[in-house]
Amino acid sequence: MAKPGFYICPLILFALFVYGLFQSPVEYDSYYDSLEIQLNYLYPFLVLLPIFTCVYGDELKSGTMVTAIGRGLSRTKVILAKFIDTLVLSLTFCLFFLLMDQITFDRFSVVLTKVQILRVLSAYLACWLKIQGFCAFAAIFVYLTWNSSVGVIAGLISIAFSKMILDWLQSHTHLPFYDLTLLGQADQARRQFDAGNAWVHHILFVLLWYAVFLAFSALFFNRKELDL
């Protein structure tokens, strides 16, 4: 039988789908203006809790992770497996949000140009990279405390305040506090893609940030004493 947290994800997706069916008529310009807030705050907030409940919460409660380690699975492989789990789930959510937008466009007969479609796709790609970054950052606190709730709190706080704080620091010090972070690099990749410029190197910097978060997770997890 699937883990209890597994059912949270489809339930939330279904609720969002129903909500999308009753949206007011939209035009591309107003839609794209509101998309920025949705992708930076609303969507990460919506998906972090169900992802963590599904990937970490149930496993910690049931002891599945400890059992796997006791049977010889390395802690590094556990961390990587959980990272891939969150990667797949966050992608699933983003694809569903994109599908909701498409259904809304079809319902109100909104036809997008090729350029507009590419802008929407790049926005969702950046959103996916950010959500995975929030999950990878929050996972550090799970391995540090062995408590998924602490990870959720850390993730929600980072979603709510990280961009605001980093933007403030950058504007007041004129140092690239935001631009060099995972969030900033994801935004740079999106902007450069939209402008038709080179953007892949920004994705590589995002992957580097993932590696840093995974390294910290491994550092704390390897020091954690478990009752095997």
Feature-to-residue mapping (PLM):
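Secretory targeting signals
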Residues: 6, 12-55, 80-149, 155, ...
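Transmembrane helix-loop junctions and nearby membrane-interface residues
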Residues: 17, 21-25, 167, 171, ...
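Short hydrophobic, aromatic-rich alpha-helical segments embedded in or entering the lipid bilayer
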Residues: 170-191
